[in-house]
Regions:
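Residues lining hydrophobic/aromatic ligand-binding pockets adjacent to catalytic sites
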Residues: 1-128
Length: 128
């Protein structure tokens, strides 16, 4: 299971592994106060893509396409999250004010798609 939480929301035991998925450290948050298990800077969108998007909902669909292309080019960065999500809950921690149009939302969709693809591939191998 993959959950999402804003960096300013309190941690809970039900969060499972908490992973910060931002390239930049969130403003106004002390490292000692943010309860995370990992900070995957490399999984965040590139600086160019992040600046271009600028959290503009009108650019959301194109942002997702470009971000997914970036993720496709670096599977080593996200495969560990897929494995962790299979073992138990993980929570992607993000800093955006917009809960619907941010890289964590896109990343969750991407990871869930990869999990479904792997599951379907395994089923096909069992049937064959």
């Amino acid at each position: 299971m993959i959950k999402l939480k804003r960096v300013y929301e309190a941690a809970a035991s039900s969060d499972g592994s908490r992973v910060l998925v931002e390239r930049l450290w969130p403003r106004g948050v002390r490292k000692a106060s943010l309860r995370i298990d990992a900070w995957l800077k490399e999984i965040g969108p590139s600086n160019d893509l992040r600046r271009w998007f600028a959290h503009d909902p009108k650019k959301w669909d194109v942002f997702r396409e470009r971000y997914f292309a970036e993720l496709d080019s670096k599977p080593k960065v996200w495969k560990g999250l897929v494995q962790a999500a299979r073992r138990g809950p993980i929570t992607l921690i993000y800093s955006s004010r917009d809960p619907e149009h941010n890289n964590a939302v896109a990343l969750k969709d991407y990871l869930q798609t990869k999990m479904k693809q792997a599951k379907n591939s395994a089923r096909r191998k069992l049937v064959a």
